[in-house]
Each structure stands twice: as structure tokens, then as C-alpha cells.
């Protein structure tokens, strides 16, 4: 109670995913409760919800985990030590979700496997394109990709 904050849920996102079997009275009670707590509520089809969270919530956990594994260079202690000293806000921001609770990562994987796999495959395609840009020294295509990402990011953040 001492650590409670009245604004804890202000503007937090809550997605309600009613189905044909959802009790409308219960849905209304939840809606009122979440709105009264200051939440930003939306209603969505459960299938679309699961696809969206696979892309914007679940996939980043596994990508960040891979990033951490990539830079944790056990075979080269000097590189590992210097990387640890140089890692700053960019690395911290990018890797934060990869350092989370492994049990949560497994639960998400088990409960949204198909959508997460689709997101991973799409990511692999995108990173392969970047890899090809590097191999071909095609800085123009790489710049185009980075510009698009900068523009598209505004849709999410």
C-alpha cells in the first residue's frame, strides 16, 4: 500500500478481446473499472490482438535476448570487458526486455507460438536484407531502409 501510486495505470493500454461467448455485463464492468483507473482501453478481435502483441511485445524479448547473447563474447574477455564498459543507454534500451523474467518468455512462447514464429520469420527476412546490403556495400539501399524505419517508428512511439 505504501508503494501504491494513484496514477499507476494512467494511460496504460488495456485490450479487451471479447468473443461470442463473452458475458456482456462482465465486459462492461471491466471496461468501467479500467477506465476509472485511467487506462486507455480498446476492444479487439483476439486473433488480431495475438498477432499484434507477437510483433510489438513478444518478438522484442527474443530479439533482445539474441542481442545480449551476441555481445556476450566469452571467448574474448578483453572484448567482453570493453563492451561492458562502453554499453550505454542505446544498448540498455535495446536489450532491456531481453533481461527480463525467463518464465514469462516461455509462457508467451507457449501461448502465442504461431504468431511469434511468423514474426521471427519476417524479422529474419529483414535482417537478411540488411546483411546483403553490407555484403554488397550497398549503402544507398541500407540508408533507404533506415530512413523508412525512422519514418515508420513514429507510428508506434
Roles of regions detected by a PLM:
Residues 1-41, 50-53:
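Rossmann-fold dinucleotide-binding core
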Residues 24-37, 48-75, 84-99, 121, ...:
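Active-site-proximal catalytic alpha-helix in oxidoreductases
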Residues 44-45:
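Conserved FAD/dinucleotide-binding core of flavoprotein oxidoreductases
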Residues 56, 78, 130-131, 156:
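A generic membrane alpha-helix/interface feature
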Residues 67-74, 131, 138, 157:
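Long, hydrophobic, amphipathic alpha-helical segments used as structural scaffolds
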Residues 80-149:
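Interdomain hinge/lid region at the active-site interface
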Residues 151-157:
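Long, positively charged, glycine-interspersed low-complexity recognition regions
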Amino acid at each position: 500500500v505504501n508503494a501504491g501510486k494513484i496514477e499507476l495505470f494512467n494511460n496504460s493500454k488495456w485490450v479487451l478481446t471479447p468473443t461470442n461467448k463473452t458475458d456482456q455485463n462482465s465486459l462492461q464492468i471491466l471496461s468501467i473499472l479500467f477506465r476509472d483507473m485511467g487506462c486507455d482501453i480498446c476492444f479487439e478481435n483476439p486473433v488480431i490482438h495475438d498477432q499484434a502483441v507477437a510483433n510489438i511485445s513478444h518478438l522484442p524479448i527474443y530479439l533482445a535476448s539474441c542481442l545480449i547473447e551476441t555481445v556476450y563474447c566469452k571467448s574474448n574477455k578483453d572484448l567482453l570487458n570493453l563492451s561492458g564498459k562502453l554499453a550505454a543507454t542505446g544498448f540498455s534500451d535495446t536489450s532491456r526486455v531481453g533481461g527480463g523474467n525467463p518464465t514469462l518468455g516461455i509462457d508467451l512462447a507457449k501461448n502465442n507460438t504461431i504468431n511469434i514464429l511468423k514474426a521471427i520469420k519476417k524479422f529474419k527476412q529483414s535482417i537478411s536484407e540488411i546483411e546483403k546490403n553490407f555484403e554488397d556495400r550497398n549503402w544507398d539501399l541500407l540508408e533507404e531502409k533506415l530512413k523508412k524505419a525512422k519514418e515508420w517508428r513514429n507510428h508506434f512511439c
